[in-house]
Amino acid sequence: MLPSRLPGTPVLTHGDASPDQVLYERSSGRIWLTDFDRVRLAPAATDLGSYLAADPTSPGHALLEGYAEHRPVPAAEQLGVAVARSRLARLADPLRHADPSWHERIGVELAAIESIARSPEKETAWA
């Protein structure tokens, strides 16, 4: 069972962090974030979990290693819970986007979320 709240000090979060919300300007090296409609105060694991959940096939090593250069990375269990909560928030996306296989995709996603909820610390082991 997922906890109702993530532990941790609330910080300003994007609320829907994912690779498509980040723009990179090659000429200057600047990074821009977009789409702030879900900005809120929440533990840092919220945005990390959201970003990791956006591409579950990617282990997220580069993101977490870069993050660790500037801030302590939340515990693996916290990240796993954040990933599961983010995937749960996006659960209806296939239906909303009229995907013909929405029923199957939601079923697969629910199974993945249940697996993460049983062992959240295994979801983001990166060290």
Give the role of each language-model region.
Residues 1-14, 113, 117-125:
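An alpha-helical support segment within catalytic cores of ATP-dependent transferases
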Residues 5-6, 24-28:
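Short basic/glycine-enriched coil/helix segment immediately N-terminal to the Walker B
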Residues 11-12, 26-62:
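Active-site Asp-x-Gly
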Residues 17:
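Hydrophobic HxD+1 residue recognition
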Residues 20-22:
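Hydrophobic residue at the +6 position relative to the catalytic HRD Asp in the kinase catalytic loop
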Residues 31, 74-75, 94-127:
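Regulatory N- and C-terminal appendages and interdomain linkers associated
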Residues 45-72, 84-102, 112:
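Active-site activation/catalytic loop segments of kinase-like enzymes and analogous catalytic loops
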